[in-house]
């Protein structure tokens, strides 16, 4: 049991701690309670983000997840052979040896970024099973106070504490560990003490989020359009407009099936992708044997140097097409919540890599003989007897490729919303077994509409490819920067390896970025415009959220004011329990006096409830609630913080109230059992009383009898309190929701007025309301409105 004075004097904090409290003497000779506890949040933090599901995972489950990986993760990477060569050589092949250079670029880019960076490094930088840029941001938030919302609590410090490495090391190892810890502490201090650095980190995170969402719109457009384009070979009468509208029809069906969930879609699509990979791998082997097996020389990286030496600036520009070979790698990371590391590595190494590399090598062998067919390299290199099966599988696999990025967008938005960086939308958990599998109806509708608009407007895979490339490489570059911070702050890797990682990946990704930005006017503006809008939405929402929180925090109601309000003669105590929802995690919100002034009555038991998301995936239900009692105790006013991880789903109102009241009764019991002992400050050794306040001069029998009497009285007292709370709950529960209207101050700048009064107001009116997010029954809902000038 831990007891302390909370913010806003007169509040007593008792967290649901160990059942065996111990005592310690402070430096002033005072007896205090000591808490020794390691809860599930502590254990999550001490893992440093290591998602080791495979350690306790059976092979049957691993193989089943590996099978689903094909249907969810690999569609985008697996369908890249449809358009990589045509986009890279959009001006034609100048020299047949250029094919060796491009194939070598594809091989080593694929190995470097997809295998080394994502499959073997980034997947291990997950946040206890969650991947993506926001998961990296939350992982950093657990090790440094980088959040812009000032709602951290001392209890969170305990839960998010990082266990120190054992001091029982060899001297040389200990010196290295000490240096790494000093370096990590320096980075931690920089992140916590520099507001510009924290803002920059946040902006990079939401930029990556915006790019991922934009990519979820562009991937379906380019994948399906490139697959449908193969119809022109067998149906020359089809024009571009007809191909575009066929693509739109397929896109509509794709987004319509998203509501069935990733779990079902994965089982449905996995056989399709497996057949597709077997087909393109087999066709690749055929082309190597039939045309030019010598292209396998491209595994020698010297052909990359020869390619750039021969083509110069043109070779640099062509990198915008080469990078399309590793599109979809971010989905491997962001969709990790649905799968395990071992299942991804297994299916990737033995299924995806051989098939895709054989497909690229086979096309290169074919184009060495028929370079004029580069505009339709994939279908032209496919044997005619396999054309129709290939076309059907290409269409199906393109749909699957789109599924990977759509799932990635859903997961990313779910994380960002939980961290207060995205407007409130409905998140549907589509699987009871895997909480990372979600579906967001509003986002699905917007993504589907945007994909159709881009397809109709662009009408060409080359234009969409340029836009697609910017999304891919920007997200990868931001991931590299965040991974570098994780290596220093969380993993505490040797600085040499950190520099190698940062230099190699940041430099190569920057070269790719400059290449795609060169063609900004030829389609690159599409994701930039979409991301700018999305960043604006997230930035406005988060900015006003932070400002509103600070406004309420600066105007918390004092203890004297609370006593005055609840002691009014005209104030009536209504039977039942009232749950007053507020964003504040400490203190009484300013809307409470407003409620008393308008409606001079409150419930017999009143709890100020804050729903708070911690930067961890899950919070154990037994550790969900923190309570404080607002003094004086006879008024039955409590503060409650309900803590969730960003992947936890909120319970419905009935279950939430039942769990809250149960924990509140435990809290009342603990206050009665330990509260008095914790408040006793015993001067040792001059005190005439022991730690229980019993005179030392009393005989042993008298002391024992007095202890028993007090124990019986305390048990009887807390039993009465528990029964009282239970009776009040049975009389009814009312949910009181503070609806604050936020406006800019009259003398604010024009920009601030536009952001707060118009942009934020529009978002707030059109997103889901708080009562729907909290699943509050309308028959038990009371809304209290108040205007804030920020």
UniProtKB/Swiss-Prot annotation:
Its main location: membrane. It is a multi-pass membrane protein. Residues 1-64, 120-198, 258-264, 340-345, 407-437, 491-492, 541-790 are cytoplasmic. This is Potassium transporter 22. The keyword Transcription regulation does not apply. One of its GO terms (cellular component) is membrane. InterPro entries: K+_transporter, K_trans_C, K_trans_N. GO terms for molecular function: potassium ion transmembrane transporter activity. GO terms for biological process: potassium ion transport. Keywords: Ion transport, Membrane, Potassium, Potassium transport, Transmembrane, Transmembrane helix, Transport. High-affinity potassium transporter. It is found in: Membrane. The chain crosses the membrane at residues 65-85, 99-119, 199-219, 237-257, 265-285, 319-339, 346-366, 386-406, 438-458, 470-490, 493-513, 520-540.
């Amino acid at each position: 049991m831990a007891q302390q004075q909370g913010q806003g004097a007169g509040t007593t904090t008792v967290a649901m701690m160990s059942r065996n409290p111990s005592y310690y003497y402070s430096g002033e000779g005072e007896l205090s309670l000591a808490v020794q506890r390691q809860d599930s949040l502590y254990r999550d933090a001490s893992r440093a983000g290591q998602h080791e599901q495979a350690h306790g995972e059976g092979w049957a489950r691993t193989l089943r997840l590996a099978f689903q990986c094909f249907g969810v993760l690999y569609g985008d990477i697996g369908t890249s052979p449809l358009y990589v060569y045509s986009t890279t050589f959009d001006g034609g092949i100048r020299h047949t040896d250029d094919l060796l250079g491009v194939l070598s670029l594809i091989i080593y880019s694929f190995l470097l970024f997809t295998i080394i960076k994502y499959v073997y490094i980034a997947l291990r930088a997950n946040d206890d099973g969650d991947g993506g840029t926001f998961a990296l941001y939350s992982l950093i938030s657990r090790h440094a106070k980088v959040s812009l919302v000032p709602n951290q609590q001392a209890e969170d410090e305990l839960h998010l504490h990082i266990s120190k490495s054992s001091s029982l090391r060899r001297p040389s190892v200990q010196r290295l560990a000490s240096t790494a810890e000093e370096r990590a502490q320096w980075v931690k201090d920089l992140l916590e003490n520099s507001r510009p650095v924290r803002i920059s980190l946040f902006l990079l995170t939401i930029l990556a989020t915006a790019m991922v969402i934009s990519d979820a719109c562009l991937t379906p457009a380019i994948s399906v359009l490139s697959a449908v384009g193969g119809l022109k070979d067998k149906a020359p009468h089809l024009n571009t407009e007809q191909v575009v509208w066929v693509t739109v029809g397929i896109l509509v069906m794709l987004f319509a099936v998203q509501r069935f969930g990733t779990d079902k879609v994965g089982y449905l699509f996995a056989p399709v992708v497996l057949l597709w990979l077997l087909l393109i791998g087999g066709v690749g082997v055929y082309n190597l044997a039939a045309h030019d097996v010598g292209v396998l020389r491209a595994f020698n990286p010297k052909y990359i140097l020869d390619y750039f030496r021969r083509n110069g600036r043109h070779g640099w520009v062509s990198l915008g097409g080469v990078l399309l070979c590793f599109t979809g790698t971010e989905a491997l990371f962001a969709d990790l919540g649905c799968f395990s590391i071992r299942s991804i590595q297994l299916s990737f190494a033995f299924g995806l890599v051989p098939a895709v590399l054989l497909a690229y090598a086979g096309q290169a062998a074919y184009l060495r003989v028929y370079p004029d067919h580069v505009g339709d390299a994939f279908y032209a290199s496919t044997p005619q007897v396999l054309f129709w099966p290939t076309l059907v599988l290409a269409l199906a696999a393109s749909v699957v490729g789109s599924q990977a990025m759509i799932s990635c967008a859903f997961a990313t938005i779910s994380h960002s919303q939980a961290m207060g960086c995205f407007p409130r939308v409905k998140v549907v958990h589509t699987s009871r077994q895997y909480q990372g599998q979600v579906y967001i109806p509003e986002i699905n509708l917007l993504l589907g509409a945007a994909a159709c608009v881009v397809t109709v407007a662009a009408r060409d895979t080359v234009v969409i490819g340029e836009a697609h490339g910017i999304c891919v490489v920007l997200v990868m570059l931001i991931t590299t920067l965040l991974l570098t911070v994780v290596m220093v702050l969380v993993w505490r890797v040797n600085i040499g390896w950190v520099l190698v990682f940062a230099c190699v990946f940041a430099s190569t990704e920057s070269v790719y970025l400059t290449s795609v930005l060169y063609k900004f006017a030829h389609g690159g503006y599409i994701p930039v415009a979409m991301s700018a809008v999305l960043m604006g939405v997230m930035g406005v929402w988060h900015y006003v959220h932070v400002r509103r929180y600070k406004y309420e925090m600066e105007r918390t109601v004092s203890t004297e004011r609370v006593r005055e309000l609840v002691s009014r003669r005209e104030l009536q105590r209504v039977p039942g329990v009232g749950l007053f929802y507020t964003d504040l995690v400490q203190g009484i919100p300013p809307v409470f006096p407003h409620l008393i002034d308008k409606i001079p009555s409150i419930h017999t038991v009143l709890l100020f409830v804050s729903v708070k998301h911690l930067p961890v995936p899950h919070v154990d239900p037994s550790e969900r609630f923190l309570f404080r009692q607002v003094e004086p105790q006879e008024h039955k006013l409590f503060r409650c913080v309900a803590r969730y991880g960003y992947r936890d789903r909120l319970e419905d109102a009935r279950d939430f109230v039942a769990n809250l009241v149960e924990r509140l009764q435990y809290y009342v019991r603990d206050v009665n059992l330990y509260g008095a002992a914790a408040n006793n400050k015993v001067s040792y050794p001059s005190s005439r009383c022991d730690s229980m306040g019993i005179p030392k001069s009393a005989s042993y029998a008298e002391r024992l009898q007095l202890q028993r009497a007090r124990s019986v009285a305390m048990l009887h007292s807390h039993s009465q309190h528990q029964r009282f709370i239970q009776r009040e709950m049975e009389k009814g529960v009312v949910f009181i929701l503070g609806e604050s209207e936020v406006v800019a101050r009259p003398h604010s700048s024009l920009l601030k007025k536009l952001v707060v009064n118009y942009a934020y107001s529009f978002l707030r009116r059109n997103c889901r309301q708080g009562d729907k997010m909290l699943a509050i029954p309308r028959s038990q809902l009371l809304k209290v409105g108040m205007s804030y000038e920020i």
